[in-house]
Structure formats: structure tokens, C-alpha cells
From Swiss-Prot:
GO terms for cellular component: plasma membrane; proton-transporting ATP synthase complex. PANTHER family: ATP SYNTHASE SUBUNIT B, ATP SYNTHASE SUBUNIT B', CHLOROPLASTIC. Keywords: ATP synthesis, Cell inner membrane, Cell membrane, CF(0), Hydrogen ion transport, Ion transport, Membrane, Transmembrane, Transmembrane helix, Transport. It is a single-pass membrane protein. Pfam families: ATP-synt_B. The keyword Cell membrane applies. This is ATP synthase subunit b. The chain crosses the membrane at residues 11-31. F-type ATPases have 2 components, F(1) - the catalytic core - and F(0) - the membrane proton channel. F(1) has five subunits: alpha(3), beta(3), gamma(1), delta(1), epsilon(1). F(0) has three main subunits: a(1), b(2) and c(10-14). The alpha and beta chains form an alternating ring which encloses part of the gamma chain. F(1) is attached to F(0) by a central stalk formed by the gamma and epsilon chains, while a peripheral stalk is formed by the delta and b chains.
Length: 157
């Protein structure tokens, strides 16, 4: 066997193997690599987009939280204002009611005072009439009259 012929055969076989690989094996491998490259690029773009969307979502979340805080503060301020108004209204109503009760009590006191005065006048006039009748029924005696007036003054006290 000739070494040159063997080398030439090997060269032809290598050329056929290279042609076969380039024609049938290499295109699917290149296609798979391109597909993987596209998928990796898409993944990287999606990751970048995800980071961007995450940053936007965090900013939006902070804005919503700030809006919620301001809304809560506004609601609390309104509730406080309303509570103060209710307290002021209740104070006003209570003062009006206290004034009415005071006026009613004053009127009742005046009415009771008038009643007691009238009753006292009636009692005094009855006692005076009794004293005068007692004085007129008996003879005029200074000592006796002094005793009667003393008893009369005792009955008044």
C-alpha cells in the first residue's frame, strides 16, 4: 500500500465528511444556536423591561401610598373638624337647655315665693283677726293685752 494513496483517500473522505456536515449537520446546529441566541436576547430584553416596569411599579406604588396617606390625613382632619363641630353644637344646645331650665326654675321659684307670701299673708291676717277678736272679746286690760300680743308673736315665730 502506498502512503500517498492512503493520504489521498483520507483527504477525499475528509472532504466528503466536511461537505456532508456542512450540508446536513451544520444548518440545524446554526439554526438551533440562532434560535437560542434569539431566546437569550428576548430573555435579556424581557429582564430589562421587567426591571424598568418594576421601577415604574415602585414609583407608582409610592405615589399611591402618598396619595393614600394624604387622603387618610384629609379624612382624619374632616372627622376631627366634624367632631369639634358636633361638640360645639352640643355645647350650644346644652347652654340653651340650661338657660331654659334656669328660666323655668326661676319662674317656679317666683311662683312658689308668691304662693308662700300669699299663704303667709293669709296666716298673718288670720292670726291678726284672731288676736283682734280675742282682744275685743275680753275687757281692755293692758297686762292681758301684752300677754296676748306676746303669745301672738310667739305663734308667728
Amino acid at each position: 500500500m502506498n502512503i500517498n494513496l492512503t493520504m489521498f483517500g483520507q483527504l477525499i473522505m475528509f472532504a466528503m465528511f466536511t461537505w456532508f456536515c456542512m450540508k446536513f449537520i451544520w444548518p440545524p446546529i446554526v439554526m438551533a444556536m440562532e434560535e437560542r441566541q434569539k431566546r437569550i436576547e428576548g430573555g435579556l430584553l424581557a429582564a430589562e423591561r421587567g426591571r424598568f416596569e418594576k421601577a415604574e411599579a415602585q414609583i407608582k406604588a409610592k405615589e399611591i401610598i402618598n396619595q393614600s396617606k394624604s387622603l387618610a390625613a384629609e379624612i382624619i382632619a374632616n372627622a376631627t373638624r366634624q367632631a369639634l363641630n358636633m361638640v360645639e353644637d352640643a355645647k350650644y344646645i346644652a347652654l340653651k337647655e340650661a338657660g331654659k331650665v334656669k328660666e323655668q326654675a326661676q319662674a317656679q321659684l317666683e311662683q312658689d315665693t308668691i304662693c308662700v307670701r300669699n299663704e303667709l299673708k293669709n296666716q298673718v291676717s288670720d292670726l291678726v283677726i284672731q288676736g283682734v277678736n280675742a282682744v275685743l272679746d275680753k275687757e281692755v286690760d293692758v297686762k292681758l293685752h301684752q300677754q296676748m300680743l306676746g303669745k301672738l308673736s310667739e305663734s308667728l315665730s
